[in-house]
C-alpha cells in the first residue's frame, strides 16, 4: 500500500526524533553529568590552587595566582583576560566567554586542532587571573 505525503512526513519525523533520543544512550551518556564532572576541577582552579591535566593529548596547566598565575598549553602561555563578572576570554576564542581559566584553555585546545600555540605578538596585555 503506497504512503501519502502526511504518512511519509510523520514517519520521517518519528525516525528523526527516535535517532535524536538515542544519541545520549549511544555516546555513553555524556550530558549534564559529564559537564558537572568536568567542572569540578575547573572550580578548584579559581580558588588559588594550581591545576594540571591532559586534554585531547595536550598538557594544560593553570598556575596558582600566588605563583604569578597564568594558563599554559604544552608549556606555552595562553593569553587570558578576566572580566569583572568572573568570565574569561582567551586569545584563541575571542568571541566565547568561559566560566573558568581551565574551560578557556580546553576550548583553546579544541580550536588549535593539533597546531602549536603561538606566542602573543602584541605584548600589550599581561595574563591576570
From Swiss-Prot:
Keywords: Copper, Signal. Disruption phenotype: Cells lacking griE and griF show accumulation of the 3-amino-4-hydroxybenzaldehyde (3,4-AHBAL) intermediate. Residues 1-37 form the signal peptide. Residues 34-45 have a biased composition (Low complexity). Predicted to be exported by the Tat system. The position of the signal peptide cleavage has not been experimentally proven. Residues 32-51 are annotated as: Disordered. GO terms for biological process: melanin biosynthetic process. GO terms for molecular function: copper ion binding. Coiled coil: none annotated. It comes from the Bacteria. InterPro entries: GriE/MELC1_sf, MelC1, TAT_signal. PROSITE patterns: TAT. Belongs to the melC1 family. Involved in the transfer of Cu(2+) ions to the apo form of o-aminophenol oxidase GriF in the grixazone biosynthetic pathway. This is Copper chaperone GriE. It comes from Streptomyces griseus subsp. griseus (strain JCM 4626 / CBS 651.72 / NBRC 13350 / KCC S-0626 / ISP 5235).
